[in-house]
């Protein structure tokens, strides 16, 4: 495989409260000898605080686009990346530029679920958005596919908001 099913830098890049002791997760992993990077040695080019990081997708104080992109990275990009296990063409990593994601206003190459003029994400039109449909169901075609039996209702609300916030393309 050309990828690893696991956590990524942007997912782990945050401070955490360890029973009253606030510390950066990377520095804790370093102290436990689980990673070999020496963040404070002066040779590492970027300290953890300077690296990109996800936001909490359920924190409504954060920008809706950042929340949606963070959710996609944590729940979908594990397969939907270049050379990933998903056989669609999208790249849902948080660091991928929006115009390179192959997601917005792109027709699905697989199931359309009976949605007329379906798009993976139809800007401004949640009802034509296959991704929203997939996260709204728990049956064949659901996303995420693994380890989930319940619909993530806050995520469905988030993606509806995000899709509505996207500008519809000009009519041709």
Q: For each predicted feature, which ranges?
A:
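Sequence context surrounding c-type heme c attachment/ligation sites in exported
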Residues: 1-172
């Amino acid at each position: 495989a050309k990828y690893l099913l696991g956590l990524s830098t942007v997912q782990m890049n945050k401070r955490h409260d360890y029973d009253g002791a606030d510390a950066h997760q990377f520095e804790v992993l370093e102290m436990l000898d689980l990673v070999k990077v020496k963040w404070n040695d002066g040779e590492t080019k970027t300290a953890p605080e300077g690296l990109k990081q996800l936001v909490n997708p359920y924190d409504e104080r954060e920008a809706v686009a950042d929340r949606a992109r963070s959710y996609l990275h944590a729940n979908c990009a594990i397969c939907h990346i270049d050379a990933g296990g998903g056989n669609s063409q999208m790249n849902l990593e948080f660091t991928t530029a929006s115009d390179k994601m192959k997601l917005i206003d792109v027709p699905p190459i697989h199931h359309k679920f009976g949605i007329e003029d379906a798009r993976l994400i139809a800007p401004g039109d949640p009802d034509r958005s296959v991704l929203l449909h997939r996260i709204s169901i728990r049956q064949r075609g659901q996303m995420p596919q693994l380890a989930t039996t319940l619909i993530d209702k806050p995520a469905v609300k988030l993606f509806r908001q995000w899709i509505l916030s996207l500008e519809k393309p000009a009519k041709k």
